[in-house]
Amino acid sequence: MDFGIALAPGVDAWQTVERAERLGFSHAWFYDTQMLCADVFVAMALAAARTSKIVLGTGVLVPSNRIAPVAANALASLNRLAPGRVVFGVSTGFTARNTMGLGPMKLSELREYVRVVRALLRGDTVECELEGTRRKVRFLNPEAGLIDITHPIPLHLSAFAPKARSLTAEIADGWMNFVTVLPTALQEVEEMAAACRAACRPPDGLYKTGFTLGCVLREGEDAGSRRARAQAGPLVPVIFHAFLERTVDPALLPPELGPAVSAFRAQYETYAPPDARYLQLHKGHLMCVRPEEERFVTPELIRMATFTATAAELRERVRAMAAAGYQQLAVQVVPGQEAALEDWAALAATV
């Protein structure tokens, strides 16, 4: 089982990635959330220049953030810095679009975007739509050595719904999933395997990564400790955000969360301006717990929705994930909580 990290891009994120590489982590995944973080490719380039082994992936690139030729150029430029260590992770958009009041893109738009980016990275001439007109484009002088389209850049799709998983099985080299409750994570990887079989490809040929937040609890430490709240707590409000904005089907809401979601909704309705409440809702998304959200981040929810448990418990979860078909667990490093890297590295050594 590989262990990776996920992180919010910043100009000093390379320090975390360099530290992760020294500790044996296999991958570093960078969020593409332009209204919250620094530019994803700036952060990745700095990390690429200061590391030599760790794989660097966009986790995930959002098509509406940049046109396909620009994305292909950024990936190929990064590949010049870190040949063979770049992964093109992409999806229809969650945080990057919600922070601007937008929902996810259409799968058809994602498919087209991926088609163009991959063709350009192969060195092909490809037709794409630019400003309402179909145009033929290609990299004109890759032989100049300014970019690298020689070393392959694998495609990993983040896919949570059946149609997205079918697309992943059809075109991708890897699948990215966000895991909270272990039984659900195991069910979802089986559904991904079924999609692979339906697409007539062996499930083992698709590299599967589960992303999460969590905390390796020390002896006698509670899930409500300050350390656990800092490392894992930021995921809990995002669950409320998802139900509130209907990113997640409300039918999936556990009955016991009903009162808390109602209270969170009442709080949300106080946000201003009324036509852009998302501006306050998503401030610090997955990076911290805002003061008004603290009361919703209970020890019970931290345990239920994140990978927060003792090392022994987490070891069994990871082994169950590996047995089910996951090849990597990627844990987000919350800003200011980089010391968690040593905890997860110690756990990885025992799995």
Regions found by a protein language model. Give the residues of each.
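Hydrophobic faces of well-ordered beta-strands that scaffold small-molecule active sites
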Residues: 3-7, 28-30, 56-59, 86-90, ...
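An alpha-helical appendage that flanks or caps ligand/catalytic pockets
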Residues: 103-145, 190-320
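Active-site mouth loops of central-metabolism enzymes
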Residues: 1-11, 61-69, 149-160, 214-218, ...
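N-terminal beta1-alpha1-beta2 module of alpha/beta enzyme domains
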Residues: 1-58, 153, 334
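Acidic-and-aromatic substrate-binding clefts and catalytic sites of carbohydrate-active enzymes
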Residues: 7-12, 32-39, 63-69, 182-186, ...
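Conserved, mostly hydrophobic/aromatic
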Residues: 24, 47, 78, 117, ...
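Alpha-helix-loop-beta-strand connector modules within alpha/beta enzyme cores
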Residues: 41-58, 113-116, 120, 345-351
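Short, acidic/polar
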Residues: 9-20, 74, 159-167, 310-320
